[in-house]
Amino acid sequence: MENAKTGTTTVGIVTKDGVVMGTEHRASMETFIAHKTAQKLYKLDYNIGMTTAGLVGDLQVLVRYMRAEINLYRIRRKMYMPVGAAATLLSNILNERKFFPYYVGLLVGGFDSKGYHVFAIDAAGGAIEDKYASVGSGSLFVYGVLEDRWKDDLSLDEGINLVIRGINAAMRRDAASGDGISVATITKDEGFVELSQEEVEKRMKKLKLK
């Protein structure tokens, strides 16, 4: 049986002050918009967040697995799991199922003693760290914005605006992406903090994206 095509747009970037992660809200099946407020941005722990693209059932199972393992790590070792360790754990879970895979594309981001990190992880468990990454059907449009505007000394505030710009570009051209934007920051001082929808809307108006 042929799998129904789904789509989404997710973004993660590293700034000098923290990590910014964002997604849009649309869940689709082929040309049908199945849901307009789908959650694709998750807090795994104080220092780690994850964005999800793919089949909802697979994504929700993986989020539960990761939260459980990360909580056990913190309880046993009295410390937060490093971001690289979380990416490796998720990579191993996916690789074990590579012949009967989870249909997902994931971003894991956050901070640890070595700094701020973003990892892109594919359905076969391939994990690549980069300063910025995008996963999903809208990623081609996002990368155009990121390549043009990302810089090494990007501030957290600039990073938030850049993620919003990137997702907005995808929503304009990718039919499988739309219906709003979720954004979260992950910093050493405040951990994982999701912006309110009012704040996102305010920034979009200030950037003249609405």
UniProtKB/Swiss-Prot annotation:
It is found in: Cytoplasm. PROSITE patterns: PROTEASOME_BETA_2. GO terms for biological process: proteasomal protein catabolic process. It catalyses: Cleavage of peptide bonds with very broad specificity. Residues 1-7 form a propeptide. The keyword Phosphoprotein does not apply. Keywords: Autocatalytic cleavage, Cytoplasm, Hydrolase, Protease, Proteasome, Threonine protease, Zymogen. The formation of the proteasomal ATPase PAN-20S proteasome complex, via the docking of the C-termini of PAN into the intersubunit pockets in the alpha-rings, triggers opening of the gate for substrate entry. Interconversion between the open-gate and close-gate conformations leads to a dynamic regulation of the 20S proteasome proteolysis activity. InterPro entries: Ntn_hydrolases_N (IPR029055), Pept_T1A_Psome_bsu_arc (IPR019983), Pept_T1A_subB (IPR000243), Proteasome_sua/b (IPR001353), Proteasome_suB-type (IPR023333). GO terms for cellular component: cytoplasm; proteasome core complex, beta-subunit complex. The active site is at 8 (nucleophile). Its EC number is 3.4.25.1. GO terms for molecular function: threonine-type endopeptidase activity. Its main location: cytoplasm. The keyword Cytoplasm applies. SUPFAM superfamilies: N-terminal nucleophile aminohydrolases (Ntn hydrolases). HAMAP family: Proteasome_B_A (MF_02113_A). NCBIfam families: arc_protsome_B (TIGR03634). Component of the proteasome core, a large protease complex with broad specificity involved in protein degradation. Belongs to the peptidase T1B family. The 20S proteasome core is composed of 14 alpha and 14 beta subunits that assemble into four stacked heptameric rings, resulting in a barrel-shaped structure. The two inner rings, each composed of seven catalytic beta subunits, are sandwiched by two outer rings, each composed of seven alpha subunits. The catalytic chamber with the active sites is on the inside of the barrel. Has a gated structure, the ends of the cylinder being occluded by the N-termini of the alpha-subunits. Is capped at one or both ends by the proteasome regulatory ATPase, PAN. This is Proteasome subunit beta.
